[in-house]
Amino acid sequence: MNKVCGLDVHKDSVFACILDEQGKIFFEKRYGTLTPELTKLRDDLVEKGCGRVAMESTSIYWMPIWHVLESDFELTLANPYFIKQLPGRKSDVKDAQWIAECLQKDLIKSSFVVDGVLRQMRQYSRQHRRLTKNLVRLEQQLDNQLQRCNIRFSNYVSNQGSNVSLRKIIKALIAGERDPTKLCALVHGRTQNKHGKQTITDSLDGVIEQVDIQMLIQCMDQIDLIEKQQASCFTHLEELAKEHFAEEISLLCTIPGINKLSAMFILAETGNDMSAFQTANFLVGWIGFRPRNDESAGKIHSRKTLHGNKYLRQIIVEITWSAARSQKSFLGKKYNDLAKRMKSKKALIAIARKILVIIYNVLKTKQPFDHKKNMQAVVDGEEIIEVDTINNIFKIDGEDVMAERRMNLGI
């Protein structure tokens, strides 16, 4: 066995422990986390003949160390939860030494770490979603400010953030307009016809003070700034995706519920190389959609899903809501069928798992998803027969790449 190194990563320090071929401590040292110190760490590991290095995924502090070492060593990123669960550790063993021992005995399963372009795409995609959350918060704050002034127009429109009429009204209020009749003229005719012109006019008759105007100005300035930042993230993300993953995006867009933006988000999290996951079930487990196996003496105690990649989980759930509403796809029909005999959110997770398996096979086979082969055939207008072709849509040289489908209901 070659020499191995375990790194105990902290915010301001890194503890390194190198073990020799016999498992004895060969070298120990504490380093800082500034770039010159990390460079010294790399040089020392090279000088000592270390081949493999392992560290725990401590917050974001492991990332700079990974960037410095990745070109010279075989790196392993370990989940701290799994390291702590391994038996045999003595109380006096240091963290770095224990990590090195586990690495030397091949007891550590490496976490999935993206590199290069995907690393950049991840930052853009996650920032885009953070900005979306901030935007929703500001839109709610804006609505609260209008409600304080007894401007109740938001009660009669949906999707307040992107409502053009509401934006026009706010800009008019900031400009000094107070006449509810003139404000009502800015409202789309469809909204006036639906709720009545007088009702809309009355909803715009409020009591506004100067402090309210200042709060509206600040909210609108922040919203405009976030929208510009969001557009910038989307532009950079689109450029990277178009240059490196144009084919994969077009393939993913053939799946019900997935558009260009969600396809880019998915690729930023999973990448386009599915060899990182042995089967679709490994990808399902990585995201946390695989039910926990909590069964004893034939009695199932829990089927709660596990923890996983929260970013991809949110994206897949949003996609699933979109696909579940469609009655023109196999997924929408399957959701309605499952929702009749279980809670709607449980049915949603079941469909989300199906979509994740489809995504895995689309990226693995480089073949578009043909939802027509999965549609349910209606016979005589009453009896619904599910066309069971989902199992043989994806074949590689005659071998079924979806054998794990039979482990669960459906896909």
Segments predicted by a language model, with ranges:
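A detector of single, family-specific signature residues
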Residues: 1-411
